[in-house]
């Protein structure tokens, strides 16, 4: 179990937040890569099928990076999606046609919106050079995925997390 302490590595200090980013990205890839691959086949619109290919490919690359980083930094990774992520997958997979597309975009856009701010916080605070580079790759991918999902025209209000408190 992670004790929350900052650990020293040859790439700089590794904080609990740094480790959490690696774990969160792994969790995201476990369900988003799978469901994007499904949407490449089951999406009812050509646009959903197109964006799903790009999302799946980028999640595959992020997953490889997360697993490599975890090995180098001795971070234990999850092996299955969370209960919520499994519910989202079941909700998407249980639908068809345009309803499938809308539900797919809703859950993926919501998940990307939730992790986006955390990636920025870690990038802004990490002193670990490996995590910094990883956070930059994650930031670029998540921003791109949000744009792709929004480009479908199916991202309604329920696809966005609550705004931050000020």
Cite the ranges covered by each PLM segment:
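His/Met- and acidic-residue-enriched segments that coordinate or traffic transition-metal cofactors
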Residues: 1-166
């Amino acid at each position: 179990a992670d004790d929350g302490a900052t650990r020293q590595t040859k790439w700089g200090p590794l904080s609990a937040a740094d480790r959490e980013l690696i774990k969160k990205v792994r969790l995201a890839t476990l369900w988003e890569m799978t469901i994007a691959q499904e949407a490449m086949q089951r999406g009812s619109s050509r646009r959903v099928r197109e964006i799903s290919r790009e999302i799946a490919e980028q999640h595959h690359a992020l997953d490889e990076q997360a697993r490599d980083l975890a090995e180098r930094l001795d971070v234990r990774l999850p092996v299955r999606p969370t209960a919520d992520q499994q519910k989202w997958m079941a909700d998407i997979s249980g639908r068809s046609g345009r309803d499938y597309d809308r539900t797919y975009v809703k859950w993926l856009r919501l998940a990307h919106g939730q992790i986006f701010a955390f990636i920025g916080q870690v990038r802004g605070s990490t002193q670990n050079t490996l995590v910094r580079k990883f956070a930059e790759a994650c930031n670029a991918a998540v921003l791109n995925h949000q744009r792709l999902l929004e480009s479908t025209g199916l991202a309604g209000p329920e696809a966005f997390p609550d705004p931050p408190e000020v």
